[in-house]
A protein has these predicted regions:
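Non-transmembrane domains of secretory- and envelope-associated proteins
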Residues: 126, 139-146, 154-237
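Surface loops and adjacent helix of pleckstrin homology
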Residues: 37-39, 75-78, 87, 137, ...
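Acidic/charged, solvent-exposed loop-and-adjacent secondary-structure segments enriched in E/D, K/R, S/T
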Residues: 73-103
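Short, surface-exposed beta-strand-loop junctions and turns on beta-sheet-rich folds
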Residues: 40-42, 79-83, 140, 166-169
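Short, hydrophobic/aromatic-rich segments at coil-to-beta transitions
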Residues: 29-35, 126-135, 158-163
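A short, surface-exposed beta-strand/turn
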Residues: 23-28, 53-55, 65-68, 146-161, ...
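A short, amphipathic edge element
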Residues: 108-119
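N-terminal mature ectodomain segment of secretory-pathway/periplasmic proteins
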Residues: 1-79
Length: 237
């Protein structure tokens, strides 16, 4: 993928703050990988006659996480730690779909409609594309973004683009948003030799880099909701 991040508050006013490239992979029911392989940051032009440049900053790394269906593994480059978050049993097998961006990780229409108000916004000039606009229904999703535009290719019916609008986005005033473009889309099929398939091998526990520390967080304990005692109808009031 290619990713452009716009930040009106901490970035330039008229262009993107960072440009990244990387890969996203997904395998049913709940295996996923998100890896930023290169991130370039905005550098202001040295004079009015020159253009801004984008350069890699030493020590700055993008996101890298893997979900194997039972745990999420995240690389913390700043602290040289591989963090494993074990998922509660009731979330294993469905964590990615319930995450912030279900459009990329196999959510079905029922799940999408449960979490979002969705409408078609395809322009008459769009070629071989379907554009959808999704507004979050829950406070949890609304805390992550204001709305999302999903661009679907009619050739393979896979997402070819995604625009995630920041909560503070205001057209003409605040352009904070994240734009994804998915160019090399591919569908891989499972087989009985998954462990020998390089595509599926990415979803097993990632290796620990030399000199790094592995940190394991146990699954959080989910407690049943507290029931309120019903009042005895014979109790005097």
């Amino acid at each position: 993928f290619q990713r452009w991040q716009f930040d009106t508050v901490y970035g330039p006013a008229n262009t993107f703050k960072t440009f990244s490239t990387g890969k996203i992979q997904y395998a049913e029911p709940d295996k996923g990988l998100f890896k930023v392989e290169e991130i370039l940051s905005y550098h202001a032009p040295v004079s009015a006659a020159t253009k801004p440049s984008y350069k890699a900053i030493p020590g700055v790394h993008g996101e890298y996480w893997v979900c194997d269906g039972k745990s999420i593994f995240e690389y913390d480059y700043n602290n040289q730690k591989l963090i494993q978050q074990v998922l509660p049993a009731e979330l294993q097998g469905q964590n990615i779909i319930n995450g912030p961006l279900p459009f990329l990780f196999g959510a079905n229409a029922a799940d999408i409609n449960r979490r979002f108000w969705v409408r078609a916004i395809t322009s008459p000039t769009a070629k071989k594309e379907i554009w959808l606009e999704a507004y979050p229904k829950s406070a949890q999703d609304a805390s992550n973004y204001q709305r999302i535009h999903i661009i679907i290719s009619t050739e393979d019916f896979l997402p070819k683009g995604l625009v995630i609008f920041d909560r503070s986005y205001v057209k003409g005033k605040n352009h904070s948003r994240t734009v994804f473009s998915f160019q090399d889309r591919d569908v891989n099929f499972a087989s009985t030799f998954d462990k020998l398939n390089p595509f599926f091998r990415n979803f097993y526990e990632p290796s620990l880099p030399s000199g790094w520390q592995k940190v394991v967080h146990a699954a959080p304990i989910t407690r049943p909701p507290t029931r309120q005692a019903t009042q005895n109808p014979n109790t005097p009031r």
